[in-house]
């Protein structure tokens, strides 16, 4: 990070079709957790979220905050500790249990009656509820609306063919006055198949622009040694803020 290379915009990678047919099954995601292939997890939390936390929360109290494809994101406890109510969805039961264990939180679990085979895990404090199910089944559980959505590792993990369906679900969960932070990546998609998938600025605007004002807050070169195995030499993270039009 932070070298002198120019930050490339997504338009400099013209082959936006390279990943369009790429599909990962839910079983493959669950296997990543079983096999500890969770390089996407950030033990110290997300640095750009820390930087823009005040912009995201806007000084408001007792918000409902949604974490799509939450994994064991440490930021869920950050928000709960600040007095907010956190709801997440994750296909891996292992990931959810790891979250509660690693954060030293006691919890209960119960079936979600509206979704066969699904469960909800609730912290004993009552302000963290994690749904173990397919995200696309979640609306059937009537989880209500949210003031804030933190979308990191979610849109970029959804199969490209499911993005419109995904954005429709996300927008259906927003309350009036919502604020939505989205993190996406730009890299050469002909060299790495994903996930995380390459998402262009144009795609972000197509998916969310009809309902949201869209502001790109920052672009950061996040290239690390592990990215060399992807066959790339640069990866740019873009952080967007969506607000209600």
UniProtKB/Swiss-Prot annotation:
The organism of origin for this protein: Bos taurus
Translocase among keywords: no
Gene Ontology MF terms: S-adenosyl-L-methionine binding; thiopurine S-methyltransferase activity
Assembly: Monomer.
Positions that bind substrate: 40
GO biological process, one term: xenobiotic metabolic process
Gene expressing this chain: TPMT
Main location: cytoplasm
Protein name: Thiopurine S-methyltransferase
Superkingdom of origin: Eukaryota
EC nos: 2.1.1.67
Family to which this protein belongs: Belongs to the class I-like SAM-binding methyltransferase superfamily. TPMT family.
Top enzyme class: transferase
Reaction(s) catalysed (UniProt annotation): S-adenosyl-L-methionine + a thiopurine = S-adenosyl-L-homocysteine + a thiopurine S-methylether
Stored HAMAP family: Thiopur_methtran
UniProtKB keywords: Acetylation, Cytoplasm, Methyltransferase, S-adenosyl-L-methionine, Transferase
Annotated residues for binding of S-adenosyl-L-methionine: 29-40, 69, 90, 152
CC per GO annotation: cytoplasm
A Pfam family this chain is assigned to: TPMT
Residues modified as N6-acetyllysine: 58
Annotated compartments: Cytoplasm
């Amino acid at each position: 990070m932070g070298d002198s290379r120019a930050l490339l915009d997504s338009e400099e990678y013209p082959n936006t079709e390279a990943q369009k047919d790429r599909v990962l099954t839910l079983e493959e995601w669950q296997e990543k957790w079983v096999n500890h292939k969770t390089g996407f997890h950030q033990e110290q939390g997300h640095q750009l979220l820390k930087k823009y936390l005040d912009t995201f929360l806007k000084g408001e109290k007792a918000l409902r905050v949604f974490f799509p494809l939450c994994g064991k994101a440490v930021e869920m406890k950050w928000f709960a500790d600040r007095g907010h109510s956190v709801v997440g969805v994750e296909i891996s039961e292992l990931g959810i249990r790891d979250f509660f264990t690693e954060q030293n939180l006691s919890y209960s679990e119960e079936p979600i009656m509206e979704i066969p085979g699904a469960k909800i895990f609730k912290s004993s404090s009552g302000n963290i509820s994690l749904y173990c199910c397919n995200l696309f089944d979640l609306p059937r559980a009537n989880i209500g609306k949210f003031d804030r959505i933190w979308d990191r590792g979610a849109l970029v993990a959804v199969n490209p063919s499911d993005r419109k369906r995904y954005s429709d679900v996300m927008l259906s969960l927003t309350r009036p006055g919502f604020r939505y932070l989205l993190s996406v990546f730009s890299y050469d998609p002909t060299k790495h198949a994903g996930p995380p998938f390459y998402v262009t600025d144009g795609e972000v605007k197509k998916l969310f622009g009809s309902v949201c004002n869209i502001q790109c807050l920052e672009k950061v070169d996040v290239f690390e040694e592990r990215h060399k195995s992807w066959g790339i030499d640069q990866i740019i993270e873009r952080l967007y803020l969506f607000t209600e039009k």
